[in-house]
């Protein structure tokens, strides 16, 4: 009897632990925030089990739609993605993140026009000397096709033009490492990852990539960080979402990690990239 009781207690404990598990999958841009918030949440909710993974916005949306994970994170609106039924998902805006073009410092440039940036990523400009830099071949590093950061960048910079065929990388960290160590390279990453002194962050049309400029939309390259659930979240998931939207995360963790609180934004953007003043 005692042995049976011990087994039942053990099974109950496992069931409770499993029921408290929240798997978060998707945006690599949001991964840093989700991981840190998850770690902090566990300190005050020791029975919680939050697992955070990247994979890109496309993966996050498809996984949450399939019911394979509790939360899918994305840099893009669900309704813009093929194969995703946005009506079946619930959207929670958690933060805003800026996106910045970065180059290896050997290129010798610190500012490009939006047109020059577009011409580089479509293959029209192939040498840094064409934009005032060194006589050095340009090597484009793109993001993977499921990347929300790529979707935002191409939507706002390329305006429907076909990007050049290039090496593709999934994560912000990998892109930063490649650009910092490879002469001639250019790519783009989210603000929270652009803190390496070995890369050159580019201004666009003389406007610097700062959070303050994002808040007013002077810097156009930014996206919302979305948390998506399949329909109404269960109680445990809702508690974690409420924590993400609460003052501790929004006022402390979000700015500390280089993101921007939704409350700081002076503009709003819809799924068609239309921007209006709040």
Go through the PLM ranges and name each one.
Residues 9-13:
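C-terminal motif of bacterial Sec signal peptides marking the signal peptidase cleavage site
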Residues 14-58, 62-66, 70-278:
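Exported/periplasmic ABC-transporter solute-binding proteins
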């Amino acid at each position: 009897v005692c042995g049976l009781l011990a087994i039942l207690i053990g099974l109950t404990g496992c069931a409770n632990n499993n029921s408290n598990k929240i798997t978060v999958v998707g945006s690599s841009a949001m991964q840093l925030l989700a991981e840190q918030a998850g770690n902090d949440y566990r300190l005050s909710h020791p029975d919680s089990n939050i697992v955070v993974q990247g994979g890109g916005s496309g993966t996050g949306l498809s996984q949450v739609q399939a019911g394979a994970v509790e939360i899918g994170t994305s840099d893009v609106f669900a309704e813009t993605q093929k194969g995703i039924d946005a009506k079946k998902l619930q959207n929670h805006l958690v933060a805003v993140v800026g996106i910045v073009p970065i180059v290896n410092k050997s290129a010798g440039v610190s500012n490009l026009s939006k047109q020059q940036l577009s011409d580089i990523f479509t293959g029209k400009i192939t040498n840094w000397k064409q934009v005032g830099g060194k006589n050095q071949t340009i090597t484009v590093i793109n993001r993977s096709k499921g990347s929300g950061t790529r979707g935002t960048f191409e939507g706002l910079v390329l305006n429907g033009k076909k990007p050049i065929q290039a090496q593709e990388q999934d994560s912000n960290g990998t892109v930063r490492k490649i650009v910092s160590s490879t002469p001639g390279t250019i790519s783009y990453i989210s603000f929270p990852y652009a803190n390496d002194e070995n890369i050159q962050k580019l201004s666009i049309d003389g406007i610097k990539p700062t959070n303050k400029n994002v808040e007013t939309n002077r810097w156009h390259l930014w996206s919302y960080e979305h948390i998506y659930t399949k329909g109404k979240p269960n109680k445990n998931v809702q508690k974690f979402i409420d924590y993400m939207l609460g003052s501790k995360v929004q006022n402390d963790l979000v700015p500390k990690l280089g993101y921007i609180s939704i409350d700081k934004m002076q503009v709003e953007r819809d799924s068609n990239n239309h921007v209006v003043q709040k």
